[in-house]
Amino acid sequence: MVLQALIIFFAQLIYVPILTLRTIMMVKGLKQKAAAMGMLEGVIYVVALGIVFSDLSNYYNMAAYALGFGIGLYIGAVIEEKLAIGYVSIEVNIPQKNQPLINRLREMGFSVSSSSVEGMASTRCRLDCTARRDREKEFIKIVSEYEPQAFIVSFEPRNFKGGYITKAMKKRREKYLKRKAKEDAH
């Protein structure tokens, strides 16, 4: 009885993070990875739910299912945050152009564009950057060191075309295809 509840609980701890990541992969357009995760998810789901449905009078199993689901959601969110899949667009609004800041961001590999914008009371400087999500905190830390009062907003772009990032992605893709062709030739 307790063993079944433990199996259900631990199955949920595996199932729900996979469910979370699969959903994110689908949203990000990573269909093949999402499909592979979906197959694994399906097997775990059927096993855990099968045990619960085998004895609906066993409240321990139902509690283990619900508790595992809740904790699994938390674990899935933590894993997703650590993986930081995808890209983020970051806008920075500062009182005036700060060339040392721009130079530092570029030295660190960030693609930064700057422009003058009309604020409520004055002309201000806006910095725009699209970067990998796993570098967002690094970007914000650098900006905060140079401009502690900066207004920073970030969001996930639905899609993008051209620019510094797509050139780099294209180069990585070409390297991958060359490497794959060499492996296939052997």
UniProtKB/Swiss-Prot annotation:
CDD domains in alphabetical order: YitT_C_like_1
Superkingdom per UniProt: Bacteria
TM helices/strands, residue ranges: 1-21, 34-54, 59-79
UniProt topology in membrane: Multi-pass membrane protein
Subcellular location: Cell membrane
Disulfides per UniProt: none
GO CC annotations, alphabetized: plasma membrane
Record's keyword terms, sorted: Cell membrane, Membrane, Transmembrane, Transmembrane helix
Recorded family membership: Belongs to the UPF0316 family.
NCBIfam families assigned to the protein according to its UniProt record, in alphabetical order: PRK04164.1-5
Protein name: UPF0316 protein ABC1774
